[in-house]
Amino acid sequence: DCQREITIDTHANILYRNGNWKEYDLLKLNLTSFFTLQQMITKVDPRYSHFLTSILNSNNEIPETIKILSWNYDTQLEMAYGKIIKSDDIYSVLDKMKIHSKFLAVSHSNTNPNIFKLNGSIFYYYANGFRKFYLNSGLTENLNQSNLERLIDNHNNYFDLISKEKMDYSSALSYAFEEEKKEDQYIHK
């Protein structure tokens, strides 16, 4: 069906409007896996590191006076920041960068986000809270057999869970047309 539409976003919008949650969640899973694999292949664009190092203060924080809007699904900003602070831990990077998106809020202690990801990110989060789950578990940018196998295993496991409607977490990808999901739209175990 996606081949008949002009863009993947149009196809996603049609699935969303028709309440085809299973197909919609599978599309988001496929996009998440694609972008994760693409990042493993192409690595971090050096422009992100250059941009961040030009705005970070001496504590490697984005100043409160700077707000960033991003419509990218990928985690290039997060990966570049992780490289700067020498951290592969996605949880600490998200909190330190003060990232907010429709479905992936900054930690409760952070009330003044610096980065607003308008289309979300290639993450999964648990339906009942703020626990973030990264498809590839870290910010690694290396394509090796172990990481590729983990990505494929995770993709296949999530695909099975979504297909069986037994998944209790949801994609952090979002579209402008998408409202926050209601409790009955989540797929629960």
Residue ranges and their predicted role:
Residues 1-189:
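Conserved catalytic alpha/beta core of Sir2/sirtuin-type deacylases, generalized to analogous enzyme cores
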